[in-house]
Amino acid sequence: MVYKFERKDIKVNKYYFTSESVTEGHPDKLCDYIADSILDECLKQDKFSRTAIEVFAYNNTIEVVGQVTSNAQIEIEKIVREKVKEIGYDDEYTGMNYKNCEININITKQSPDIALGVDVGGAGDQGIMFGYACNETDNYMPYAINLAHKLANRLAIVRKEKIIPYIRPDGKTQVTVEYVEGKPKRIETVLISTQHLAEINIEKLREDVKKEVIDAVIDSNM
């Protein structure tokens, strides 16, 4: 009697997941921070304030537009300059300077139709967000986004503490993680982009960012 054995390859459930994080100087984050700060000041003075604020940043210019209905007396231009300065946009090399940036403000009161709708049905135009806790990290965040946030935070630290003195506020980090059977196996890719002085050699930038940012955050075993 002859027995025939056939080998069947076991398929491994493998996939890649990418997450990104931006630094405080990224235009999206800058604009969000300004809008949030205006809202905070309104609510500090009048808890019944209603705001719908949009902020745009480009070419040393900040645009603040939208609708505000509030009894609060706020200085929007002052808030904008304070936040731009706080983030670190303080010279011509960054493309934005709190000292001389142009600030255009076009704020009106909330339209009666929208006000009535809010009175009757509550705030509209809301997004639906979802999330979950997981056991991949100590803070229950997914591994990829946790690393991306840590890299972005480290990028901000080395700028503010002048460990890498020539980088500027705008930056982004991206991490791709390989998962096997639903668990992080290894880091596939780490990408970091950062604003910097024009005269800096790209090789010097890569060397400094790898040493002071990536190596300070990423586990070499991954």
Residue ranges of each PLM-predicted region?
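N-terminal, positively charged regions that mediate nucleic acid binding
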Residues: 3-52
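Glycine-rich, mobile lid/loop segments that gate access to catalytic sites or pores
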Residues: 3-7, 18-21, 78, 85-222
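Alpha-helix N-cap/helix-initiation motif
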Residues: 23, 27-31, 73, 140, ...
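Short glycine-centered, acidic/aromatic-flanked micro-motifs in structured strand/loop junctions
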Residues: 24, 66, 194
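Short, glycine/acidic-rich hinge or "gate" loops at secondary-structure transitions
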Residues: 48-56, 163-169
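Short, charge-patterned binding micro-sites
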Residues: 52-70
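Active-site-surrounding "flap" and adjacent substrate/cofactor-binding loops of secreted or lumenal enzymes
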Residues: 70-84
